[in-house]
Amino acid sequence: MADTTGRIPLWIIGTVAGIPVIGLIGIFFYGSYSGLGSSL
């Protein structure tokens, strides 16, 4: 965990990029299941 100045740790990038992706996938599948995502 040392020498992180000027360099973003990979796990932070994965977490920040993964949460919205998982959220969008969850909303998409929930919308498709409930019928609201039929227009997508």
UniProtKB/Swiss-Prot annotation:
GO CC list: chloroplast thylakoid membrane; photosystem II reaction center
Membrane topology field: Single-pass membrane protein
Covalent S-S links between cysteines: none
Keywords from the named record: Chloroplast, Membrane, Photosynthesis, Photosystem II, Plastid, Reaction center, Thylakoid, Transmembrane, Transmembrane helix
Family listed: Belongs to the PsbJ family.
Main location: plastid
Organism: Pelargonium hortorum (Common geranium)
Gene: psbJ-A
Compartment(s) where it occurs, according to its Swiss-Prot or TrEMBL record: Plastid, Chloroplast thylakoid membrane
Function of the protein: One of the components of the core complex of photosystem II (PSII). PSII is a light-driven water:plastoquinone oxidoreductase that uses light energy to abstract electrons from H(2)O, generating O(2) and a proton gradient subsequently used for ATP formation. It consists of a core antenna complex that captures photons, and an electron transfer chain that converts photonic excitation into a charge separation.
Name by which UniProt lists this protein: Photosystem II reaction center protein J
Subunit composition and interactions: PSII is composed of 1 copy each of membrane proteins PsbA, PsbB, PsbC, PsbD, PsbE, PsbF, PsbH, PsbI, PsbJ, PsbK, PsbL, PsbM, PsbT, PsbX, PsbY, PsbZ, Psb30/Ycf12, at least 3 peripheral proteins of the oxygen-evolving complex and a large number of cofactors. It forms dimeric complexes.
TM ranges: 8-28
A Gene Ontology biological process term: photosynthesis
InterPro entries assigned: PSII_PsbJ (IPR002682), PSII_PsbJ_sf (IPR037267)
HAMAP family: PSII_PsbJ
